């Protein structure tokens, strides 16, 4: 066991507009070089586009997108007697949220729309409707876990 002190989790404050902690975390993932105000403009702009196009509450669409992208199981490498097995394990709630946010932002960055807010809005709308690159990533992860179900007894 390590003797080092485990780093304390910093408190994340709710965002000023919607009062949502998940949205703040999302902004932190969008942020580059510590430019929080730019990240806020991008995220709020994307949510406005979502509201305009879908005529739905944007924060609801955002949460639907996160729920649809969050993986239930993933595979982790486990070495047993010279062989490395991909062992399927359940994803903890905290990691589930982090992966969903990471995959959603990554998919948005890889899109072809002109501005980041347009890309983010499009990916959020796709994810809330169970389409898009981020949802495909989750499906691939689940498929990997399903394919390696035989090794689930190596779980730790």
Curated annotation (Swiss-Prot):
The domain of life is Bacteria
Q: Which UniProt keywords apply?
A: Ribonucleoprotein, Ribosomal protein, RNA-binding, rRNA-binding, tRNA-binding
Give the residues annotated as coiled coil.
Answer: none
The UniProt GO MF terms for this protein read: rRNA binding; structural constituent of ribosome; tRNA binding
Question: Pfam families from the entry?
Answer: Ribosomal_S7
Give a yes or no for keyword Cell membrane in this entry: no
One GO cellular component term of this record is: small ribosomal subunit
Q: Does the keyword Flavoprotein apply?
A: no
Q: Which family, according to UniProt?
A: Belongs to the universal ribosomal protein uS7 family.
Share what the entry says about its subunit structure, partners included. Part of the 30S ribosomal subunit. Contacts proteins S9 and S11.
What is the protein name stated in its UniProt record?
Small ribosomal subunit protein uS7
Q: Which organism is it from?
A: Maricaulis maris (strain MCS10)
Gene name of this polypeptide: rpsG
């Amino acid at each position: 066991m390590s003797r080092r002190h485990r780093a304390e989790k910093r408190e994340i404050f709710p965002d000023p507009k919607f009062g949502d902690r998940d949205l703040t975390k999302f902004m932190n993932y969008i942020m580059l070089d510590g430019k929080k105000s730019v990240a806020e403009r991008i995220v709020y702009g994307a949510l406005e586009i979502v509201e305009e196009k879908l005529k739905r509450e944007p924060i609801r669409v955002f949460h639907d997108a996160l729920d649809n992208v969050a993986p239930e199981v993933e595979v982790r490498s486990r070495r047993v007697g010279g062989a490395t097995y991909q062992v399927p394990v359940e994803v903890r709630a905290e990691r589930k949220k982090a992966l969903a946010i990471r995959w959603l932002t990554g998919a948005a960055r890889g899109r072809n729309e002109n501005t980041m807010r347009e890309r983010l809005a499009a990916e959020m709308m796709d994810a809330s409707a169970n389409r898009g690159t981020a949802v495909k990533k989750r499906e691939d992860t689940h498929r990997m876990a399903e394919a390696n179900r035989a090794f689930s007894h190596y779980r730790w």
